[in-house]
Amino acid sequence: MSQVTDMRSNSQGLSLTDSVYERLLSERIIFLGSEVNDEIANRLCAQILLLAAEDASKDISLYINSPGGSISAGMAIYDTMVLAPCDIATYAMGMAASMGEFLLAAGTKGKRYALPHARILMPQPLGGVTGSAADIAIQAEQFAVIKKEMFRLNAEFPGQPIERIEADSDRDRWFTAAEALEYGFVDHIITRAHVNGEAQ
């Protein structure tokens, strides 16, 4: 029995919820079902790395129902997704807002999905800064760098001109699943799933 299998089979002390997530992990399914923070990012990054090490030829499915959260934590997840040699299919369910939208769109092109009633939010960039004048200047400079990179990537994911992303991000913008498909954040709207796990 492999070390990975051993790690998964030791379910003593797990709650019912933990056991469900462990079972899903064995099917290469992981969940982002909360606000994005460092703890959640560390867990998701570890799961992606584990599954990629187990089999680099099989897809990982990332289901997203998240209001967003920390940019740095989200970028850690994104960088790990890029680092992984396997394709990562992303699925919007419920709400994929802010960093949730970013990670949804960052999935492997052709394998980004939305459930019919999912809602996707492309947010207005926020950059509140506090502290001394010197601290504010440093924070403002860093925010400008991050904002520019987020615009670049959020334009690259759907294949939109960066000018359109900048204009559309001037205010929070919500998308239905159909609108997200038209915009390019997702490639398919799921109507049902086959027994073998393939979405349709």
Residue ranges and their predicted role:
Residues M1-Q200:
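Terminal-region recognition feature
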